[in-house]
Amino acid sequence: MQEQYRPEDIETQVQLHWQEKQTFKVTEDTSKEKYYCLSMLPYPSGRLHMGHVRNYTIGDVISRYQRMLGKNVLQPIGWDAFGLPAEGAAVKNNTAPAPWTYDNIEYMKNQLKLLGFGYDWDREIATCSPDYYRWEQWFFTKLYEKGMVYKKTSAVNWCPHDLTVLANEQVIDGCCWRCDTKVERKEIPQWFIKITDYADQLLNDLDTLESWPEQVKTMQRNWIGRSEGVDIVFNVADSEEKLSVYTTRPDTFMGVTYVAVAAGHPLSLQAAATNPALADFVAECRNTKVAEAEMATMEKKGMATGLYAIHPLTGEKLPIWAANFVLMDYGTGAVMAVPGHDARDWEFATKYNLPIKPVILAADGSEPDLSQEAMTEKGILFNSGEFDGLNYEDGFNAVADKLVALGVGQRKVNYRLRDWGVSRQRYWGAPIPMVTLEDGTVVPTPEDQLPVILPEDVVMDGITSPIKADPEWAKTTVNGVPGLRETDTFDTFMESSWYYARYTCPQFDKGMLDPAAANYWLPVDQYVGGIEHAIMHLMYFRFFHKLLRDAGLVDSDEPAKRLLCQGMVLADAFYYSGSNGERIWVSPVDAIVERDDKGRIIKATDAEGHELVYAGMSKMSKSKNNGIDPQVMVEKYGADTVRLFMMFASPAEMTLEWQESGVEGANRFLKRVWRLAYDHTAKGATAPLDVANLTEEQKSLRRDLHKTIAKVTDDVGRRQTFNTAIAAVMELMNKLGRAPQETEQDRALLQEALLAVVRMLYPFTPHVCFSLWQALGGEGDIDTAPWPVADEQAMVEDSKLVVVQVNGKVRGRITVPADATEQQVRERAGQEHLVAKYLDGVTVRKVIYVPGKLLNLVVG
């Protein structure tokens, strides 16, 4: 082996070897236990960022470790290739989304290869390929035939100037990002999949996901939002109309003082027809964004409709208000308001001077003070007629039973979860395979006409989708009848909801999935991705798996057994103020930094002399210009160093702070391993290790070696605390570096230790370990070498070091057999001259013995 560690030479050679040998190519092998490790597929944005590197390094470490355990390991990769950014980039660069996307895929693929990830490249998929989305279209038509798909009108952001639909991220301060025209809400027909039919399964099966983070499961439970309550029907005064509301708090029903309805509710529209002010309010609400995060924080506004609802139990007339916080898409589009016991209702009632009636006693039994806020806690009912004195549960049931008995109520389970709207009015996505015939009948595209191919050679104007702008594209026939194709495309979450299953059989052309391959590999054993995907992607991913199961394509209930959500990668952020006071962000690579003796930044400038403000550590992002290019780091230090730092600097689930000093430290460690191996091999071959005749020092070192193997095995396999595994190997390396190399057995022991160290580091730093394994004379390639197994016998201690105290002060240390009795330890202590002089001529009054650790002799 060469004397110096030169990663650029090693990594190129090893990667070429893997490519030629197809080391990571796998097929179904029923004689082996399978292991499917998957990292969430990347969007081909153009360049890898450190978040990608962290995600894929974690996946690669797990995959390589499992392969060393003798399992048949599948680790695939692909590209989530459709989506809005490609459209923007195409307009900006005067190209089409397809070539931009394919160029990016090629570039990023080479970046992944430079990092040494062990992917089966034969299984690579790009979701924009017709060979892929063909089966998604086919499956959608099958769901339609099963009644799982329907079309209804739904609100979108509409630019009246460009006459186009805008994604939420294209609406800036309520205006179109391109022309600055005020955006309107518009109802248009869209396709939905009935995820609500699976709400109970999605909720209940969370309990089977024992190896998913509790945080993700809680977020999904909240998103599904199962609640038990009552549907209540109110008559509308002086009208034949009825008004339906749903409540989870029937115990507060006697405290209803008004009813709020959505601006788009039939009663609002009816009243607005003769009330111009209300009509203006309805129009204003129609242009309000309906994202839940914004709904929660926006100002609550309303207007009286002049209509009244009749309380079914008291006969009271309750004013009906149109309110901007009630949505037609949610429930019945109407809510009963109990301002005494609901914070939002209280805020609205206070603003518009509506009555507030308490009907639940405070915890101390007193009437609650509602002057400053609502009392939302549950408690004993009062002010509620026949229900006074009941607790929450009894009150809930008594009111519900009464409403049911009167025929104005029905117990109901509701869900916060809404059906999945899969229509997007964009070009760069998979066409939705539906056709509207001449007579208005809507039918699925026949199977023999699939895939409905998205034309890729298009001109983007940045306004209208090319397939919407071209009337010829939509023309088709079904069974000889002319029709028009759907020009909306699928939400890109469709592609990422089933890609994991297609990886099991990417070339299969007789169906969506090859059942034999899919059921061999699925479910995924380990899924790795960010917590930001907890509710959208991970919910659709679970839902789609159940759809595949019910279509007979897979035979498991859940798509992934274990989920690891890696933390974000942070970096220093610096800026200076521009001439207009705007912040101009400077890359940390370009910041010239002064630090104090504790390493804290005290001053920073850039090459042009701007004094920089240090904004602390924040997530690497384009907006703050604080991303570190992985390629630059790989060229500077090598892929193994970058991978090692990524896995050592922080626990996988926690945020990782990018520090180049830490990268340098990882590089120094690999150089140290290389140097020790080089010095060792330079002395020639070693004799076999004679375990039976080791010295105490050699036994102790071997014990440390095998304890390290046991710890690293547990840390990598069960606990997934990769940083502590690396720390344990580093600690062992320190001991190996200090160990004497004077005898044949010293060298034989170092040979055993280095072969183990190289295998323990291999999942993290595969290139350097590949070379070291060869240099050390390891059998075959390290890619097929087994994981080291801790020798239980080696970890058993023959002797113990016991601290001896006299009257609580340490007077000596003695080595005794591990199984020595207290009497034997006392005798041995008496023979130790440093101890003996303190026992001369005194009486031992008391003995405190902690087996194998401490002997305290109390004398007087």
Swiss-Prot record:
Q: Where is this motif: 'HIGH' region?
A: 42-52
Amino-acid positions noted as binding ATP in the UniProt annotation, renumbered to this chain? 622
Where is this gene product found? Cytoplasm
- Please indicate if the UniProt record lists Coiled coil as a keyword: no
Q: Keywords of this protein's UniProt record, alphabetized?
A: Aminoacyl-tRNA synthetase, ATP-binding, Cytoplasm, Ligase, Nucleotide-binding, Protein biosynthesis
Q: Which Gene3D superfamilies match?
A: 2.20.28.290, 3.10.20.590, HUPs, Isoleucyl-tRNA Synthetase, Domain 1, Valyl/Leucyl/Isoleucyl-tRNA synthetase, editing domain
GO molecular function terms noted in the UniProt entry = aminoacyl-tRNA deacylase activity; ATP binding; leucine-tRNA ligase activity
Gene Ontology CC: one annotated term = cytosol
Under the heading PROSITE patterns, the entry gives:
AA_TRNA_LIGASE_I (PS00178)
Name the InterPro entries on file: aa-tRNA-synth_I_CS (IPR001412), aa-tRNA-synth_Ia (IPR002300), Leu-tRNA-ligase (IPR002302), Leu_tRNA-synth_edit (IPR025709), M/V/L/I-tRNA-synth_anticd-bd (IPR013155), Methionyl/Leucyl_tRNA_Synth (IPR015413), Rossmann-like_a/b/a_fold (IPR014729), tRNAsynth_Ia_anticodon-bd (IPR009080)
Tell me the protein family, please.
Answer: Belongs to the class-I aminoacyl-tRNA synthetase family.
Q: What is this protein called?
A: Leucine--tRNA ligase
| Source organism of this protein record | Yersinia enterocolitica serotype O:8 / biotype 1B (strain NCTC 13174 / 8081)
